[in-house]
């Protein structure tokens, strides 16, 4: 479930705003990750205004635009507090593009390992393989690669 589905501590909310609460929560998450050397993948949804934005023309005319980093519920504070931020966008009602998922990498704090943001109009494309048995990534089937290297699974 996304972050906004989690119940907030009502006693803590009596003294601070939800904005401050979210900052406290994300600070606690960062400290937890640092202390235990783990990663948290925090899922959120786009805010209502972002969902109303649609493409005006082209293949996706009339379908929701890809949300920006600051378009998440709760605003840009989540982007400001994280080391890595990605947006997964799907056109689930599109007659031909419903099986595609676009992965937009919006923030990479540490680029020393070779990571970087995706270009604005060139996301990583994941296409569901027939019968939903996996994905091809940028039109390259990972299933075929695994078979070629004789992977044990």
Task: Name every feature range the model reports, one short phrase each.
Residues 1-30:
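Helical hairpin unit composed of two closely spaced alpha helices linked by a short loop
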Residues 5, 45-50:
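Signature of the SF2 helicase/ATPase Hel1-core->accessory helical subdomain module
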Residues 16, 31-36, 49-153:
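C-terminal regions of RecA-like/P-loop NTPase motor modules
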């Amino acid at each position: 479930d996304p972050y906004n589905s989690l119940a907030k501590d009502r006693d803590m909310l009596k003294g601070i705003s939800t904005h401050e609460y979210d900052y406290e929560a994300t600070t606690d998450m960062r400290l937890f990750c640092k202390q235990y050397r783990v990663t948290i993948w925090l899922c959120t949804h786009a805010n209502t205004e972002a969902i109303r934005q649609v493409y005006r023309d082209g293949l996706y005319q009339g379908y929701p635009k890809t949300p920006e980093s600051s378009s998440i519920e709760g605003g840009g504070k989540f982007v400001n507090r994280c080391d890595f931020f990605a947006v997964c966008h799907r056109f689930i009602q599109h007659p031909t593009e419903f099986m595609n998922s676009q992965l937009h990498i919006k923030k990479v704090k540490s680029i020393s390992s070779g990571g970087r943001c995706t270009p604005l109009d060139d996301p990583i494309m994941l296409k569901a393989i027939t019968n939903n048995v996996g994905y091809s990534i940028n039109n390259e089937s990972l299933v075929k690669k695994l078979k070629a290297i004789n992977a044990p699974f």
